[in-house]
Amino acid sequence: MRVSENFALRVHVDEVDPLRMALAAERLDYEIAVLCLELEAERLNIDDLRWLIEEIRDIREHVESVLVLPGCKLEAESAGALRRAIRRTRPLVYLLAVGGGDPKINRAAVSDTRVDLLSHPERGNPHAGLGKYEIELAREKWTYVEIDLSRLFRREGERLAWQVSRIRDLLRLRRRKRFPTTVALGARDPLELIRPKQVEDLLKLMGFEDSEVKEMCVEAPREILRWNAACKHVFTVPGVVSLG
């Protein structure tokens, strides 16, 4: 059984044709691409996700070398709205992320086993955005804390330096506390996609070791998707069992 190595994790198609994004992922040698919509928990329209699923079914006729899966990222203002949105979206997606930053949302996300990723917990914070309690919850519930590379590509000058510093804060914290961590592209346009080798080089420039790059870019995405395919979902995509 072939083991997949190149994951385009959390690639957004809110404002771009999903087929165009999938073809771009194929051109850059990705083997698995998770196409996502960003949805507001308080104003959730589940038909948006159903549309994405139908688009992905059609994509399979045009893209053969990339396994394309549906996902979503929830943005919420309250923990209650987040929990309700998780309940409605979880059965439809292979990847469920929550946009972090607000301490109460960070905590609610890592408290819920149905959540795969807590994205950018540092948003709006002068530090990595995780306290001792949130770290313990992430380890206990096996919720991955995500490093969002797109937040680097959309910044310059002092804002870019700030973002690099927050990623390094998270890396240092992760080395001490050993909580689940992964890396996502977060691209919202095909032009924001970069090759897997470029992802690896970028992480190494920020101080990641080879073993950390492999663990966060290959082993973590594979485990997330394999677990969800086996345990959580009614919607299935032919070939997902070949995740390795």
UniProtKB/Swiss-Prot annotation:
Q: What InterPro entries does the database record attribute to this sequence?
A: Pol/histidinol_Pase-like, RNase_P_comp-3_arc, RNase_P_p30
A single GO molecular function term of this UniProt record: ribonuclease P activity
Q: Which reaction does it catalyse?
A: Endonucleolytic cleavage of RNA, removing 5'-extranucleotides from tRNA precursor
What GO biological process, any one, is recorded here?
A: tRNA 5'-leader removal
Segments forming a coiled coil = none
- SUPFAM superfamilies per the UniProt record, alphabetical: PHP domain-like
tRNA processing in keyword set: yes
Q: What is its main location?
A: cytoplasm
Supply the enzyme class, top level: hydrolase
Q: Name one GO cellular component term.
A: ribonuclease P complex
Q: What is its EC number?
A: 3.1.26.5
Q: Indicate where this protein resides in the cell.
A: Cytoplasm
Protein keywords: Cytoplasm, Endonuclease, Hydrolase, Nuclease, tRNA processing
UniProt superkingdom: Archaea
- What's its job? Part of ribonuclease P, a protein complex that generates mature tRNA molecules by cleaving their 5'-ends.
Q: How does it assemble?
A: Consists of a catalytic RNA component and at least 4-5 protein subunits.
* Family recorded in the similarity comment: Belongs to the eukaryotic/archaeal RNase P protein component 3 family.
Name of the featured protein: Ribonuclease P protein component 3
